[in-house]
Amino acid sequence: MARIAGVDIPREKRIVISLTYIYGVGKTTAQKVLKEAGISEDTRTRELTEEQLNQLRDGLDKVKVEGDLRREISLNIKRLIEIGCYRGVRHRRGLPVRGQNTKNNSRTRKGPRRTVANKKK
């Protein structure tokens, strides 16, 4: 397995697909990096030379990936919480941030249902 940006990428897959195993690299970013490095998208990871791997590493150094990207996202969320804006409040309460309805759904964000016991009359 080749190791790029601290991630072991699969050897048997096409390089454009293998690069998407890196957090922050989707298909479009992978295609741009490969085009910049002059490597065909159909090349298998095992067929790459050490020089080509170094070109890929240099290309990915220009893009925020893995730890840097995760850190930036968490700092952005902390900043929103700290300034007390609406989005920050939604993050703090664990509710959907982007305006979705919460009456019936939003289970992903809220977690499993907490049943409330009924009072006997």
Curated annotation (Swiss-Prot):
Gene3D superfamilies: 1.10.8.50, 30s ribosomal protein s13, domain 2 (4.10.910.10)
The protein's name: Small ribosomal subunit protein uS13
Superkingdom of source: Bacteria
UniProt cross-references to InterPro entries, sorted A to Z: Rbsml_uS13_C, Ribosomal_uS13, Ribosomal_uS13-like_H2TH, Ribosomal_uS13_bac-type, Ribosomal_uS13_CS
Keyword check for tRNA-binding: yes
Keywords: Ribonucleoprotein, Ribosomal protein, RNA-binding, rRNA-binding, tRNA-binding
GO terms under cellular component: cytosol; small ribosomal subunit
Native organism: Exiguobacterium sibiricum (strain DSM 17290 / CCUG 55495 / CIP 109462 / JCM 13490 / 255-15)
Annotated spans, Disordered: 94-121
PROSITE patterns per record: RIBOSOMAL_S13_1 (PS00646), RIBOSOMAL_S13_2 (PS50159)
Function (record text): Located at the top of the head of the 30S subunit, it contacts several helices of the 16S rRNA. In the 70S ribosome it contacts the 23S rRNA (bridge B1a) and protein L5 of the 50S subunit (bridge B1b), connecting the 2 subunits; these bridges are implicated in subunit movement. Contacts the tRNAs in the A and P-sites.
Assembly description: Part of the 30S ribosomal subunit. Forms a loose heterodimer with protein S19. Forms two bridges to the 50S subunit in the 70S ribosome.
Family: Belongs to the universal ribosomal protein uS13 family.
Classification lineage: Bacteria, Bacillati, Bacillota, Bacilli, Bacillales
